[in-house]
């Protein structure tokens, strides 16, 4: 609430906030954190084999369910597709993203999307995504001057943007 008002320049006593409970019971939305290695540009090549092994294990636990793997880059998506070698994995590029998404949502098989670009504007409701894997925490790009300026002005802004991308 404080962050919202400060970003928009609104006084808190001039607006109302409505808090709604989640429609999903907490036991239906567990979060498991399993760090496997640094996914920074410097270390990603040494972490990718460990990531592939971790993803294989998660896929085995969810063998009859559809899901999505948020890859953060085409490099990671392509690596996982090549090294896991499962017909369940659906990867896309910029030209066929919508078709692959359509096939995943409407198909009967328990496919899993490999995507660096399905964090906004995509509704994987119902059985279209029973699990998600986030390969790298989606921090905003620090090379962007506006992002850096906001981060320096408001210490809470950078982690807030990161968590908003995840949820």
Feature-to-residue mapping (PLM):
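A contiguous, basic/glycine-rich beta-loop/short-helix subdomain that forms a polymer-engagement track
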Residues: 1-30, 94-97, 109-116
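Well-ordered alpha-helical segments embedded in enzymatic catalytic cores
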Residues: 50-57, 79, 99-103, 117
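Conserved RecA-like P-loop NTPase helicase motor core
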Residues: 23, 35-46, 94-167
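Conserved interdomain hinge at the start of the Helicase C-terminal
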Residues: 33-72
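Short secondary-structure boundary/capping segments
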Residues: 2-12, 83-87, 128-132, 146-151
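Phosphate- and divalent-cation-binding pockets in alpha/beta enzyme and binding domains
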Residues: 3, 76-80, 123
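Conserved helicase motor "Helicase C" RecA-like lobe of SF1/SF2 P-loop NTPases
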Residues: 67-98
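Beta-sheet entry/capping signal
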Residues: 14-17, 31, 66-68, 87-88, ...
């Amino acid at each position: 609430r404080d962050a919202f008002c400060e970003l928009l320049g609104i006084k808190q006593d001039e607006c109302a906030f409505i808090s709604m409970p989640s429609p999903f019971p907490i036991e239906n939305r567990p979060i498991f954190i399993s760090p496997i290695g640094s996914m920074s540009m410097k270390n990603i090549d040494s972490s990718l084999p460990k990531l592939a092994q971790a993803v294989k294990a998660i896929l085995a636990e969810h063998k009859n369910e559809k899901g999505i793997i948020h890859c953060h880059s085409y490099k990671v998506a392509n690596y996982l597709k090549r090294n896991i070698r499962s017909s369940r994995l659906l990867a896309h590029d910029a030209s066929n993203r919508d078709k692959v998404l359509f096939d995943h949502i409407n198909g009967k098989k328990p496919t899993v999307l490999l995507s660096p670009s399905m964090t906004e504007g995509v509704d994987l409701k119902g059985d279209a995504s029973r699990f998600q894997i986030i390969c790298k925490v989606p921090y905003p790009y620090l090379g962007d001057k506006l992002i850096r300026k906001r981060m320096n002005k408001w210490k809470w802004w950078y982690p807030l943007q990161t968590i908003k991308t995840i949820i």
